[in-house]
């Protein structure tokens, strides 16, 4: 019974993250080629002040810092990059989960949650990376769309 409740909670949270990310992606921020959204699954609200770093894989096969930011009151980061700078390549979005949970007085299992993805290999796209966090798990989803003119 507890498993079913937990499963329903996770599914509801994923639906919430997917819906809110899609709504915001089509708003005034639709020209932003990379947007991040983070939800605190324990408290059922946006995760505020989560440090996020974006890395790009270099030709030498190392990760180079590409962009960084901190989630706002809506759990979002916009304007991490511009269309001109966000070229084809392999990217890694790193969510600093340990600092977020420790600031709330919680000892989490994960120190970071990483999402690695290939961008713009099939033409220019806009990406929303959404993460749902809890102290012992995380899940992510992505919305990939054509730019809005």
UniProtKB/Swiss-Prot annotation:
It comes from the Eukaryota. Its main location: secreted. Detected in liver. GO terms for biological process: purine nucleobase metabolic process. InterPro entries: Thyroxine_BS, Transthyretin/HIU_hydrolase, Transthyretin/HIU_hydrolase_d, Transthyretin/HIU_hydrolase_sf, Transthyretin_CS. This is Transthyretin. It comes from Macropus giganteus. Gene3D superfamilies: Transthyretin/hydroxyisourate hydrolase domain (2.60.40.180).
